[in-house]
């Protein structure tokens, strides 16, 4: 096997998806701890210790204890090289999260075992379904009182329409949490409390019928023996092919805060999760084994370094090898660029990348020329598909405290919209600026960043907009007529794409009936 193929096959690129507060940032910390990237994990909420979680690094995130932007972390584990994309967990941050899911080959779904399947998880699973992404499941917070584990798995199967195959099974919960039984290894791994900041050297007892188990956990030993007969009869066996098709999820139980069960998941991801997968373009499928370089930009992050007002474009490599100083072709602009200073990430710590392979995420310095969805190749005119914008669900009019700063405001909004923090719309027949987001917190983030990064003080006003749709029509005459008759509802977005701004859903439905030749799209390919 060639050295290149060995490098590609080592890669596992995944994201963590969950509802807010299910423990996603904590699990990210613990995953990094096992990957030796962190020696002592930071604790997230109420950070009196001053140990901010490593993956939450913008000022606002540090203040709130939530992960607002998508961080990228690479670390070795076992024989693999793992790329973990941390996604915003707070319920208001989904568009960035959606797009991040286009750059991974598998996902880890974290569920709060006391609550079960929650709303944001359902929404994120819908996005993974667009590409049938394989899912690994972690039932978290076993150190608290939880719902019945069989009930939890039934809920995942019913609500998320995916079969569950338990890999580990809990013994007790809350104050009585004793550990887990690993079905495939036929061993019990015992839990010790108070070890959250370090890697536990867990005691392992081989075999359910081992008398050592009765000594270690008393009456719980007989209980788990009886329970396992029931569990094996009532659940699915793990099937690797069904997992790769996104039809079945292996399920693990543990506590991220107690640092227990995280290594079991990592073992499963390294063993079963797919290596870098082929990617669709408008004209053909790109295979990771191809020697020529290609990749696409799924996120742009402004000012990762507060000392420098720069922007970094996050690129997923799809084929070929990145080497320092190589020439890349920026397909949308038709330009060749020399890239000598691409970055690899350890959440806010940047290292210069000397080489990177399919599945890796690298950062390109961007002075305003790179957009979300851009493709880079070694000359071939390819365009990767499936990195969409999603129609916002909330809108505000944005206004300046100082009217002389209109130019800076527009510049700031366009840059923030290019990195996906927010969407901006300029109505055709007024000078208003409308900001669209998927959640309220994004509005706060934008005003905060306009102030700190662009020295612009802006305020919001309510506006009667219910939703937005991107407008397309192949017939220019019909499109011109539509523009003429509906100009008061039309705007251009940050990329100058025509958008219908609907004051109510009723208005949108009537317009769709009235103009059947016009396509009103909920998503827009970048």
Curated annotation (Swiss-Prot):
Keyword annotations of the record: Cytoplasm, GTP-binding, Nucleotide-binding, Protein biosynthesis
Gene3D superfamilies xrefs: P-loop containing nucleotide triphosphate hydrolases, Peptide chain release factor 3, domain III
All copies of domain tr-type G, residue ranges: 9-277
Amino-acid positions noted as binding GTP in the UniProt annotation, renumbered to this chain: 18-25, 86-90, 140-143
CDD domains: RF3, RF3_II, RF3_III
InterPro entries given in the database record: EF-G-like_DII, EFG_III/V, G_TR_CS, P-loop_NTPase, PrfC, RF3_C, RF3_dom_3_sf, RF3_GTP-bd
Signal peptide: none
Protein function: Increases the formation of ribosomal termination complexes and stimulates activities of RF-1 and RF-2. It binds guanine nucleotides and has strong preference for UGA stop codons. It may interact directly with the ribosome. The stimulation of RF-1 and RF-2 is significantly reduced by GTP and GDP, but not by GMP.
Similarity comment: family membership: Belongs to the TRAFAC class translation factor GTPase superfamily. Classic translation factor GTPase family. PrfC subfamily.
Stated name of the protein: Peptide chain release factor 3
Source taxonomy: Bacteria, Pseudomonadati, Pseudomonadota, Gammaproteobacteria, Alteromonadales
């Amino acid at each position: 096997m060639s050295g290149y193929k060995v490098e590609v096959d080592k890669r596992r690129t995944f994201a963590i998806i969950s509802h807010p507060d299910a423990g996603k940032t904590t699990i990210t910390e613990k995953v990094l701890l096992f990957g030796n990237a962190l020696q002592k994990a930071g604790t997230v909420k109420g950070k009196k210790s001053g140990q901010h979680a490593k993956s939450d690094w913008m000022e606002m995130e540090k203040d709130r204890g939530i992960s607002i932007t998508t961080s990228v972390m690479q670390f070795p584990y076992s024989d693999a090289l793992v790329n973990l994309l941390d996604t915003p967990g707070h319920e208001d941050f989904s568009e960035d999260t959606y797009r991040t899911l286009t750059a991974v080959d598998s996902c880890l779904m974290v569920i709060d075992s006391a609550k079960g399947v929650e709303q944001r998880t359902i929404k994120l699973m819908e996005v993974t379904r667009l590409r049938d992404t394989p899912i690994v499941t972690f039932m978290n917070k076993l150190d608290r009182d939880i719902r019945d584990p069989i009930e939890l798995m039934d809920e995942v199967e019913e609500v998320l329409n995916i079969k569950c195959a338990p890999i580990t099974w809990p013994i007790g919960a809350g104050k009585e949490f004793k550990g887990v039984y690993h079905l495939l290894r036929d061993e019990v791994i015992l839990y010790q409390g108070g070890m959250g900041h370090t890697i536990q050297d867990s005691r392992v007892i081989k075999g359910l019928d081992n008398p050592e188990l009765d000594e270690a956990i008393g009456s719980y030993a007989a209980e788990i023996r009886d329970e396992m007969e029931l569990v094996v009869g009532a659940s699915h066996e793990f099937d690797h092919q069904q997992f790769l098709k996104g039809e079945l999820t292996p399920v693990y139980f543990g506590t991220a805060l107690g640092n227990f069960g995280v290594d079991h998941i990592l073992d499963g991801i390294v063993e079963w999760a797919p290596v870098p997968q082929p990617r669709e373009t408008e004209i053909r499928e790109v295979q990771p084994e191809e020697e020529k370089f290609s990749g696409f930009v799924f996120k742009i992050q402004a000012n990762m370094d507060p000392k420098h007002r720069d922007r970094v474009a996050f690129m997923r490599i799809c084929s070929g090898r990145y080497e320092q100083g190589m020439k890349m072709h920026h397909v949308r602009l038709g330009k060749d660029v020399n890239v000598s200073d691409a970055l690899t990430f350890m959440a806010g710590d940047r290292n210069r990348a000397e080489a990177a392979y399919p599945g890796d995420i690298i950062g390109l310095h961007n002075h305003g020329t790179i957009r979300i969805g851009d493709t880079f190749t070694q000359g071939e005119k390819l365009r990767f598909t499936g990195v969409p914008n999603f129609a916002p669900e909330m809108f505000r009019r944005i206004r300046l405290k100082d009217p002389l700063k209109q130019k800076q405001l527009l510049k700031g909004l366009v840059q923030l919209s290019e990195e996906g923090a927010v969407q901006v719309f300029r109505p055709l027949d007024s000078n208003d600026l409308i900001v669209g987001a998927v959640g309220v917190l994004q509005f706060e983030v934008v005003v905060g960043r306009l102030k700190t990064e662009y020295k612009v003080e802006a305020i919001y006003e309510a506006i009667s907009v219910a939703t937005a749709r991107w407008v397309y029509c192949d017939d220019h005459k019909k499109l011109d007529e539509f523009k003429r008759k509906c100009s008061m509802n039309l705007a251009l977005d940050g990329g100058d794409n025509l958008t219908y701004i609907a004051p109510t859903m009723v208005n949108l439905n009537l317009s769709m009936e009235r103009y059947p030749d016009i396509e009103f799209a909920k998503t827009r390919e970048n």
